[in-house]
């Protein structure tokens, strides 16, 4: 039976369905799978992971998600989807055209406030003079 390696610390830098990419403190990246059926690790999570036994591939297993400073999520009527942890700021990118959804903007701002993450609203497509001016005016209450 192959011997398991010691637990190592890393940060999740990408998440793709049932696997994550974990970066080690020295900058190496390793594909890791969650232990168990449900993955609770999201980008930004600090995790404890374990490499596969020697001779059984280069991937690893996420054994534990460490305590989070915050968790950014998206919520609708049906479910909540977590997608980033331990972040300092969230950029909310709004397009001048098509017309942006104020309810989506409000949900993002409420989530940022609830999780103590500084929001930054950016208005895109400034080359579209009239739509940009209308969108800029609609953003007045958020300044």
Per-segment meaning from a language model:
Residues 44, 112, 124:
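Residue-level signal for inorganic ion chemistry
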Residues 118, 127-143:
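Canonical P-loop GTPase G-domain recognition
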Residues 92, 121-123:
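Structural beta-sheet core signal
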Residues 1-102:
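N-terminal accessory targeting/assembly segments
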Residues 86-89, 115-119:
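Short glycine-/polar-rich loops that comprise or flank the Walker A/P-loop
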Residues 104-114, 118:
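Histidine-anchored nucleotide/phosphate-binding helix
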Residues 96-99, 125-129:
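Short histidine/acidic/glycine/proline-rich micro-motifs that form metal-
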């Amino acid at each position: 039976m192959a011997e398991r390696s010691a637990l190592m610390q890393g940060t999740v830098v990408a998440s793709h369905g049932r696997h994550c990419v974990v970066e080690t403190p020295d900058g190496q990246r390793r594909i890791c799978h969650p232990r168990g059926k449900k993955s609770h690790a999201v980008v930004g999570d600090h995790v404890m992971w374990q490499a596969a036994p020697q001779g059984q591939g280069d991937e690893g297993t996420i054994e534990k998600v460490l305590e989070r400073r915050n968790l950014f999520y998206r919520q609708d009527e049906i479910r909540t989807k977590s997608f980033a942890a331990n972040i300092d700021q969230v950029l909310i990118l709004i397009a001048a055209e098509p017309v942006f959804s104020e309810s989506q903007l409000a949900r993002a701002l409420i989530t940022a406030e609830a999780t103590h993450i500084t929001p930054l609203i950016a208005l895109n497509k400034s080359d579209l003079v009239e739509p940009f001016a209308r969108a800029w005016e609609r953003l007045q209450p958020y300044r």
